[in-house]
Amino acid sequence: MGHALCVCSRGTVIIDNKRYLFVQKLGEGGFSYVDLVEGLHDGHFYALKRILCHEQQDQEEAQREAEMHRLFQHPNILRLMAYSLKERGAKHEAWLLLPFFKKGTLWNEIERLKDQGSFLTEDQILPLLLGISRGLEAIHAKGYAHRDLKPTNILLGDEGQPVLMDLGSMNQACIQVEGSRQALALQDWAAQRCTISYRAPELFSVQSHCVIDERTDVWSLGCVLYAMMFGEGPYDMVFQKGDSVALAVQNELSIPQSPRHSSALRQLLSSMMTVDPQQRPHIPVLLSQLEALQPPAPGQHTTQI
């Protein structure tokens, strides 16, 4: 778990015997805060995520999130630099030290372009989609599913490469549901941990005897692709208007026509947004299709036959 942390004078903290200077607050959620800190030993910037732990279960979940990070050494999954639990009287805070991405998230980029009246081009979308899919492939290969994939949980590296973050909702990929009590428990868990407008249909009304697998991530990936194509998720407006997302996701998605997108990309999106999870493709199938669709590298020329 790393060494204990101490908050020192002049806004510095010590993590694993290294001192970090507080720079500014980056954001906050319901029970967590993210600060920008500078490593005084190397001059690099980091994101320090502080999770408030009110109960023992909160500590266990924070530690599990750290363990999920440590499972992966992958260019499309966020690395954990250090983890520790800080005690402050009867209260605890779990601290995760993470790399800082100055480009922000995929959603920041979508919003930036939308403010200019434009969208990501297909040649920009395809490499992003490939990187996100490779990150998911690595997660699924370890027997897990992300369960909360959305544009705000995808960071952009210096070269624009996508990096999956927020692994706190990850759980086993394949869940065998046996009985109404287990179904309701999973449904309640999803309502708390899986963002509503990116949540797969099978998680809104979990059947008493069924299998929920990693293809919930494929649905969410389809929603992310839609957001890259059209500047907002397919169910964002449904949620914002107060209409039922649970009802909306049970119907086949209507994909707007646009000259910006090829029929191949539209077909790929349509396959991801298949309501029946058993008919939805697995990530390796999508990857093989995506690799064939990738634009040529700069300086490369394709020959038309």
Swiss-Prot record:
Q: Which GO terms describe its molecular function?
A: ATP binding; non-membrane spanning protein tyrosine kinase activity; protein serine kinase activity; protein serine/threonine kinase activity; RNA polymerase II cis-regulatory region sequence-specific DNA binding
**SUPFAM superfamilies to which the protein is assigned, alphabetical:** Protein kinase-like (PK-like)
- Region (Activation loop) residue ranges read 166-202
Q: Where is the lipid attached (N-myristoyl glycine)?
A: G2
> What does the record say about its membrane topology?
Lipid-anchor
Query: Among the record's GO biological process terms, what is one?
Result: positive regulation of transcription by RNA polymerase II
What EC number(s) would the UniProt record show? 2.7.11.1, 2.7.10.2
Residues in Protein kinase domain copies: 20-293
Catalytic residues per the record?
Answer: D148 (proton acceptor)
- Residues that the record marks as modified (Phosphoserine) are S197
Q: Which residues carry this modification: Phosphotyrosine?
A: Y198
The cellular location(s) given in this protein's UniProt record come to:
Cytoplasm, Perinuclear region; Membrane
* Gene3D superfamilies to which the protein is assigned, alphabetical: Phosphorylase Kinase, domain 1 (3.30.200.20), Transferase(Phosphotransferase) domain 1 (1.10.510.10)
Which PROSITE patterns does its entry note? PROTEIN_KINASE_DOM (PS50011), PROTEIN_KINASE_ST (PS00108)
Q: How does it assemble?
A: Monomer. Interacts with DRG1 (via its N-terminal); the interaction phosphorylates DRG1.
**What function does this protein fulfil?**
Membrane-associated protein kinase that phosphorylates on serine and threonine residues. In vitro substrates include DRG1, ENO1 and EIF4EBP1. Also autophosphorylates. May be involved in secretory vesicle trafficking or intracellular signaling. May have a role in regulating stromal-epithelial interactions that occur during ductal morphogenesis in the mammary gland. May be involved in TGF-beta signaling. Able to autophosphorylate on Tyr residue; it is however unclear whether it has tyrosine-protein kinase toward other proteins.
* Name of the protein this chain belongs to: Serine/threonine-protein kinase 16
Q: Which organism is it from?
A: Mus musculus
Q: Provide the taxonomic classification.
A: Eukaryota, Metazoa, Chordata, Craniata, Vertebrata
